């Protein structure tokens, strides 16, 4: 059975921390592919600084060197707010026999009960969780206790051994704006940023 990983984010800009966790995601779950999903209008996130077209282009350039990585614009072409359940449904229809895995940070896991149709979502996809520094499963709200306990036991939720890399897109944008410093950004994305003058004051 084909295993497909789904990795959503604003990617504003895409940085090495994203690649660190995407590779761990692929390796630990044994994925055939990881699909990067740049957000259009994400419901649970602040607005992005770069345009959707620029963020998509940066992700496409940065992921081109790893054959396991693919990119989809399905969240961008939807003009309304995008919800994870709707995105997963797109891939479920496209790959009806595949095993889907959604990658999320532990901060998102701890708020999963606030997501649209979360109880239906977890029937459609498995979940891989990258723990953020300071987070613990002991913080899981009671609304998720029963489900998470069962899911950890049956393997439909996996906690990755690699933690979420402590890299901040906000800090990277600040460094780019203040000094043009592109540390932590894949070279192809850094070249695109310089060429198009993104994140300048």
From Swiss-Prot:
Q: Name one Pfam family in it.
A: CTP_transf_like
UniProt-listed Gene3D superfamilies: HUPs
Coiled-coil residues: none
Q: Which EC number applies?
A: 2.7.7.18
Keywords, sorted A to Z:
ATP-binding, NAD, Nucleotide-binding, Nucleotidyltransferase, Pyridine nucleotide biosynthesis, Transferase
Q: Which GO terms describe its molecular function?
A: ATP binding; nicotinate-nucleotide adenylyltransferase activity
Where would one find the signal peptide in this protein?
Answer: none
Please give the pathway this protein is involved in: Cofactor biosynthesis; NAD(+) biosynthesis; deamido-NAD(+) from nicotinate D-ribonucleotide: step 1/1
Give the UniProt record's GO annotations in the biological process aspect.
Answer: NAD biosynthetic process
Which catalysed reactions does the entry list for this protein? nicotinate beta-D-ribonucleotide + ATP + H(+) = deamido-NAD(+) + diphosphate
What job does this protein perform?
Answer: Catalyzes the reversible adenylation of nicotinate mononucleotide (NaMN) to nicotinic acid adenine dinucleotide (NaAD).
Q: Which family does it belong to?
A: Belongs to the NadD family.
Matching NCBIfam families, A to Z? cyt_tran_rel, nicotinate (nicotinamide) nucleotide adenylyltransferase, PRK00071.1-3
Q: What is this protein called?
A: Probable nicotinate-nucleotide adenylyltransferase
Source organism per UniProt: Neisseria gonorrhoeae (strain ATCC 700825 / FA 1090)
**Highest lineage ranks of the organism?**
Bacteria, Pseudomonadati, Pseudomonadota, Betaproteobacteria, Neisseriales
